[in-house]
Amino acid sequence: MSSVNPIQIPSRLPLLLTHESVLLPGSTMRTSVDTARNLQLVRSRLLKGTSLQSTILGVIPNTPDPASDSQDLPPLHRIGTAALAVQVVGSNWPKPHYTLLITGLCRFQIVQVLKEKPYPVAEVEQLDRLEEFPNTCKTREELGELSEQFYRYSVQLVEMLDMSVPAVAKLRRLLDSLPREALPDILTSIIRTSNKEKLQILDAVSLEDRFKMTIPLLVRQIEGLKLLQKTRKPKQDDDKRVIAIRPIRRITHIPGALEDEEEEEDNDDIVMLEKKIRTSSMPEQAHKVCVKEIKRLKKMPQSMPEYALTRNYLELMVELPWNKSTTDRLDIRAARILLDNDHYAMEKLKRRVLEYLAVRQLKNNLKGPILCFVGPPGVGKTSVGRSVAKTLGREFHRIALGGVCDQSDIRGHRRTYVGSMPGRIINGLKTVGVNNPVFLLDEVDKLGKSLQGDPAAALLEVLDPEQNHNFTDHYLNVAFDLSQVLFIATANTTATIPPALLDRMEIIQVPGYTQEEKIEIAHRHLIPKQLEQHGLTPQQIQIPQLTTLAIITRYTREAGVRSLDRKFGAICRAVAVKVAEGQHKEAKLDRSDVADGEGCKEHVLEDAKPESIGDAADLALPPEMPILIDSHALKDILGPPLYELEVSERLSQPGVAIGLAWTPLGGKIMFVEASRMDGEGQLTLTGQLGDVMKESAHLAISWLRSNAKKYHLTNAFGSFDLLDNTDIHLHFPAGAVTKDGPSAGVTIVTCLASLFSGRLVRSDVAMTGEITLRGLVLPVGGIKDKVLAAHRAGLKHIIIPQRNEKDLEEIPSNVKQDLSFVTASCLDEVLNAAFDGGFTVKTRPGLTDSKL
């Protein structure tokens, strides 16, 4: 009994604060580290340490719940356990944390806390020095009797168990091989005891007190096992395995230390999981799965890799909002005001949201619609989704789908794989905590496809109101109801969306803005936002509407306002520099006036030498407020204009016409240029054209050849056969951009008619429309975006197919007032509108007398 403990710990120890678990000397446990102080301790001390001493920590039990993670150091327990960190395992799911495997060495007492941040460090006094223990027994025989009594109860308890179990046999050998003074701590950590009882054993520095406290615990375990054997006599072999002794896997390299794989903290967590499963409102099928998994978890050693997977699965199941939802705000008037305040224009989109609210007032169990906002970048599709959630009073979650090429991102990974995780849909529901959020599926048109599956196909189940009430994630493997989720998708174009997915969504077009709308958006939203971000006030900067119009027309050319917002940011940064310099100059002038009187400033400026211009500039008067941003200031800040109205210059010779094109970025004007030369009747097409546009060019030249006599069109040799000894070259500028589609047909005909007639096309006319071989003009799409592009370019007359006349109702009235429209049903009408004075013919060509 007089052996001396050979362990010597440092006099200063970093403190690891635990909440419920208690580590006793000689035992081993795993603990999770996720608070700020403990994380900093692991990263600074364990991960960067190079010596054995750096792996020794002071474990302080019974500290306040680390979930609060307050800035102040909580009250610390007086006695702790010096521990050796054996293993550190890091993980980022569900949040960054480390799992430590630590072995208790000896007790210590805190003398003084030396520092609290970034992690506590204390001066400690080592206890458990057996030669220093005060012998409070009257004789040494009394301490020996306590030791023998403890040993007998320990042996009796172990012999009641199944000795065929390796862990039990190992424990029996330890009782004979380890010193008696080490057994109370080890046995207490193995048998089922509460944290309070463990804490009492830890506080018992005297060996006599530890024996006296541990013996009743052993007696209680023995009596419990006897009672269990009486009540379940037929299953005697199983009874020996049921005793609440944790499995002992191995003896560590430290004498008397045992590894405790399933510590009290884990058991408490399992009990909490069971309680959450019982009280949760999950469906019956999910509840059965959770009950089955929790039973498997109880029988599973913590060292098994599947232990963490099963535990994470159960934690996810109890955290999912199976029946938790928010109450919708169905005040249509308030919703209208909120939408108008957040977004200007977009009347069609706002009307659809208000319609949804109105129907919800009449029918509470309405399934969430599947909306898809389609429009060019920068028009506010994503922000509208956030405003819809705000209007309804729902939670909002954005899922970026651009570049996603694995269906597991949508449906989740099966739990058989290492590192499996739920899909983005289920993970988003866990994040928001309710089952009726607004989910924004951003950039749904940019989904990829790979060997891992097609995520667009996985979305079919999610976005189908008839199926998504029973959505099954591969990770959960049980059904989850998504029918209450309001899904909003965004896309730049519907061309790349699979037809099956497109069929499940309600398409709402979000066109680009007019110049007037951009001006309103700039002065209502963009400029105030930029002023706030740059610390400026309206008293320091003034941007007139004429300046805003100049930025829109000469420095940006887009359907949205994203580039416009960046230009305002550049202006605000330049003004911020002026304001900051002005404040510096005011302070410098004030100091100069105080030092030398009122005339000091003039004296300094008069005596300034040419090489000291910088000093004179420092003493110049600060700028007057507010700083006015005019055309000269724009040129200084943003540089020379990026875009000029060059339409008239480019149409100064025959063989050039202006068409209108639609792109995912919005509408734009497109020039078509033609040239002829001596040759063999070949047609050359350049400008990265698609097959459809090439066919339109061949249609145009064929129609003109068949009607050359009626329009008096000849080649350079005076022949009505336009390709006789003549080659034609058609070019579409912006050659790096791929172009395709049938809407350039009327533009190609007009361009070639100008080339062969030698007449100029009107410089204020743009056109769009598909042609047929018989000279008919067929309707095309994207009329609104094309008209807005022509308006931005300063064009005044637009030729569109007659069957597109209905699309003019979507054009804002202020744009209509600036433009005149010609609706054409055949190419005769197109040519008459494209040339000054019309395009005269000897006999008006009909639809039947054209010939090739």
UniProtKB/Swiss-Prot annotation:
Gene3D superfamilies: 1.10.8.60, 1.20.5.5270, 3.30.230.10, LON domain-like (2.30.130.40), P-loop containing nucleotide triphosphate hydrolases (3.40.50.300). GO terms for biological process: protein import into peroxisome matrix; protein processing; protein quality control for misfolded or incompletely synthesized proteins; protein targeting to peroxisome; regulation of fatty acid beta-oxidation. Its EC number is 3.4.21.53. It is found in: Peroxisome matrix. Residues 651-837 form the Lon proteolytic domain. Pfam families: AAA (PF00004), Lon_C (PF05362), Lon_lid (PF22667), LON_substr_bdg (PF02190). One of its GO terms (cellular component) is peroxisomal matrix. One of its GO terms (molecular function) is ATP binding. Coiled coil: none annotated. It is an enzyme of class 3 (hydrolase). Belongs to the peptidase S16 family. Interacts with PEX5. Interacts with TYSND1. May interact with enzymes involved in beta-oxidation of fatty acids, including ACOX1/AOX. ATP-dependent serine protease that mediates the selective degradation of misfolded and unassembled polypeptides in the peroxisomal matrix. Necessary for type 2 peroxisome targeting signal (PTS2)-containing protein processing and facilitates peroxisome matrix protein import. May indirectly regulate peroxisomal fatty acid beta-oxidation through degradation of the self-processed forms of TYSND1. This is Lon protease homolog 2, peroxisomal. It comes from Rattus norvegicus (Rat).
